[in-house]
């Protein structure tokens, strides 16, 4: 776990992955809020989704309602996160890596930027090295056997490479499955804040997750 010279408290970078409706967003929000409260740092929500249809807009609205009253300052950044994050003492919830890659890879003019995974990997690795209170959220989408188009397969492979890098660079990684978190930590012991949250989640598992 890293500790900056002028930090207001212990911090960590965390990578959270899970399938749809597995509770990763709620877990990430609660974690970021607790990290900010315990460290006395400002709290930011980095919204990476660029809406393209009503379903996207409804999803964004639902997430906004869920965050209401939690103390987040919202930063909208569908691309170029390194230009949007300035406060190195802040706690940032970046939701999501999945949308970030999609924005960069599938262009508005219909073209496909196949180097997007490499660009995003380098950008997020640099953020991990320069910031010490980041919570990344990503969607797990590698378990089905559907035959996708070449571009979608390259997207899935690229996302997997980014996720792998984040799991290696972050202090801890969390895999969400039906509301149950499995925690992997670089330290010998799981950070207390994550351990306590896991215990709470186990007690409330079975309730509606998102």
Residue ranges and their predicted role:
Residues 20-21, 50, 98, 141-145:
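Short, glycine/serine-rich, charged loops/turns that create anion-binding
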Residues 28, 63, 93, 139, ...:
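Residue-level signal for inorganic ion chemistry
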Residues 70-119:
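Helix-adjacent hinge/juxtasegments
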């Amino acid at each position: 776990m890293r500790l900056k010279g002028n930090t207001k408290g212990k911090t960590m970078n965390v990578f959270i992955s899970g399938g749809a409706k597995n509770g990763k967003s709620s877990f990430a929000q609660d974690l970021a809020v607790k990290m900010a409260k315990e460290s006395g740092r400002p709290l930011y929500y980095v919204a990476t989704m660029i809406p393209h249809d009503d379903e996207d807009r409804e999803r964004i609205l639902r997430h906004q309602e869920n965050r209401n009253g939690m103390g987040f300052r919202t930063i909208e950044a569908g691309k170029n996160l390194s230009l949007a994050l300035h406060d190195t003492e802040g706690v940032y919830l970046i939701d999501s890596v999945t949308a970030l890659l999609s924005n960069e890879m599938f262009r508005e003019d219909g073209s496909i930027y196949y180097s997007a995974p490499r660009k995003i990997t380098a950008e997020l690795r640099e953020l991990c090295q320069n910031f010490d209170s980041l919570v990344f959220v990503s969607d797990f989408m590698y378990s089905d056997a559907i035959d996708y188009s070449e571009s979608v397969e390259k997207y899935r492979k690229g996302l997997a490479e980014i996720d792998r890098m984040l799991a290696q660079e972050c202090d801890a990684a969390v895999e969400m499955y039906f509301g149950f978190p499995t925690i992997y930590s670089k330290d010998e012991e799981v950070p207390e804040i994550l351990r306590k949250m896991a215990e709470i989640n186990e007690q409330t598992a079975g309730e509606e997750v998102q």
